[in-house]
């Protein structure tokens, strides 16, 4: 402890920033020097898992006594609204944080009422850069008409619903520099829709021009509507877990796509051909779920990941190799749906009629996460490795706990010849 006490204040404050506030204040008992140091910690975290009236008063007291010139972050975790912890208390804590120029705010609330209100001061906080809100068992209401969050770049909302469609649009329209938006159900880490425009600004007018996009997200997250469209110059699009999409407007005219992540299955998901401008693509689909797969050409695609849990993924692989002339990185995985087994490529797997252009010229890395060394798996590996003339890395990650089995896999993989003598073989390693 003497060694730590000799550290400068700024270093001690940084260390204390990673500790829950309740424990930080206990350090005031260590020595005279530590007595007031806790008051200057710029990051505050309160866990209400075992809350009572005494803890509620403690939160008020420690917030009011904090002297940090800028409150870098405030986390209010696992709040349960009841007689001793009320909506007005949460509003008071947020008001204090706003007055201290808070930059990051994260709140998770379990509410028994049908409606929940945030204080009006939050909607005009000029310093807030990140806001993560989780509300269970209620709707967020009373978002003011005038929302102004000019510094907000990241907005994550995990709510069961909104009082009106306009509420969500009104909130987002006030975030004039928003870079990342994520909407999710509060009880499901898998179901989410995320829009991320990296490195650029979403201005006020473009928010309203994207009305269809946000109506789509609202409807799909909370179960309303059946026909929606997306009409927006997005650079990152992600959708997962059986969201039903019936109409994409203008999406095929987006040459600025950077990445599209599609982790969905189901008969209505036939829109893969609409995002042929994507540079990065994650798919968990079979060819039968894609409309006109034979006509798809991904002129810009350089990074492709295919999930191996779906029946017929091997045929999708064939078509994607044939239709992706600039592909540089190919990954096979079943990491996103571990409860489903990886399906083995059948003996009747139809290989490309001719060697795809990407194998002859551009492919640099081939990765298989969850490789099992089955006969069908080996046939896919042999085809790719024997034809990829410019391959630099071949990476295989096995989930087996049997050392002997893994050693046999490694021997078999090492015996497959590659056109490039400098191609590295990495087994159970990412780097």
Swiss-Prot record:
Pfam family membership, one: F-box
SMART domains listed in its UniProt record: FBD
Chain ranges of the FBD domain: 348-398
Occurrences of domain F-box (ranges): 1-47
LRR repeats: 52-78, 85-109, 132-159, 160-185, 309-334
Gene3D superfamilies referenced in this protein's UniProt entry, alphabetically: 1.20.1280.50, Ribonuclease Inhibitor (3.80.10.10)
Name of the protein this chain belongs to: Putative F-box/FBD/LRR-repeat protein At4g26350
Keyword Lipid metabolism among record annotations: no
Keyword list, A-Z: Leucine-rich repeat, Repeat
Entries under InterPro entries matching the protein: F-box-like_dom_sf (IPR036047), F-box_AtFBL13-like (IPR053781), F-box_dom (IPR001810), FBD (IPR006566), FBL13/AtMIF1-like (IPR050232), LRR_dom_sf (IPR032675), LRR_FXL15/At3g58940/PEG3-like (IPR055411)
Originating organism: Arabidopsis thaliana (Mouse-ear cress)
Record CDD domains: F-box_AtFBL13-like
């Amino acid at each position: 402890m003497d060694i730590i006490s000799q550290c400068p204040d700024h270093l001690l404050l940084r260390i204390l920033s990673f500790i829950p506030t309740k424990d930080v204040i206990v350090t005031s008992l260590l020595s005279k020097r530590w007595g007031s140091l806790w008051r200057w910690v710029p990051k505050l975290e309160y866990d209400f898992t075992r809350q009572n009236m005494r803890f509620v008063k403690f939160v008020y007291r420690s917030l009011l006594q904090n002297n940090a010139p800028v409150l870098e972050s405030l986390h209010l975790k696992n709040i349960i609204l009841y007689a001793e912890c009320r909506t007005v208390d949460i509003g008071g804590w947020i008001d204090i944080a706003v007055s201290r120029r808070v930059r990051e705010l994260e709140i998770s609330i379990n509410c028994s009422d049908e409606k929940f209100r945030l204080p009006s001061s939050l909607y005009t906080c000029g310093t807030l850069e990140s806001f993560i809100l989780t509300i269970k068992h209620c709707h967020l209401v009373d978002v003011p008409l005038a929302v102004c969050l000019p510094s907000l770049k990241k907005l994550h909302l995990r709510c069961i619903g909104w009082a009106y469609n306009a509420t969500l649009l009104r909130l987002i329209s006030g975030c004039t520099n928003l870079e990342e938006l994520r909407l999710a159900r509060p009880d499901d880490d898998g179901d989410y829709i995320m829009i991320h425009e990296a490195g650029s600004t979403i201005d006020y007018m473009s928010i309203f021009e994207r009305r269809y996009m946000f109506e789509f997200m609202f409807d799909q997250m909370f179960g309303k509507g059946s026909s929606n469209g997306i009409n927006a110059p997005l650079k990152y699009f992600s959708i997962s877990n059986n969201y039903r999409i019936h109409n994409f407007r203008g999406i095929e005219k987006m040459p600025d796509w950077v990445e599209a992540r599609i982790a969905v299955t189901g008969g209505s998901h036939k829109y893969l051909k609409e995002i042929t401008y994507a540079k990065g693509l994650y798919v968990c689909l079979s060819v039968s779920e894609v409309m006109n797969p034979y006509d798809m050409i991904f002129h810009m695609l350089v990074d492709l990941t295919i999930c191996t849990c779906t029946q017929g993924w091997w045929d999708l692989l064939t078509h994607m190799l044939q239709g992706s002339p600039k592909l540089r990185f190919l990954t096979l995985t079943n990491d996103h749906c571990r409860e489903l087994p990886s399906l083995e490529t059948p003996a009747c797997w139809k290989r490309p009629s001719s060697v795809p252009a990407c194998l002859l010229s551009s492919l640099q890395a081939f990765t298989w996460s969850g490789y099992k060394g089955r006969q069908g798996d080996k046939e896919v590996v042999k085809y790719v490795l024997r034809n990829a003339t410019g391959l630099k890395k071949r990476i295989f990650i096995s989930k087996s706990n049997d050392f002997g089995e893994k050693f046999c896999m490694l021997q078999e993989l090492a015996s497959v010849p590659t056109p490039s003598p400098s191609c590295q073989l990495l087994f159970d390693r990412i780097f």
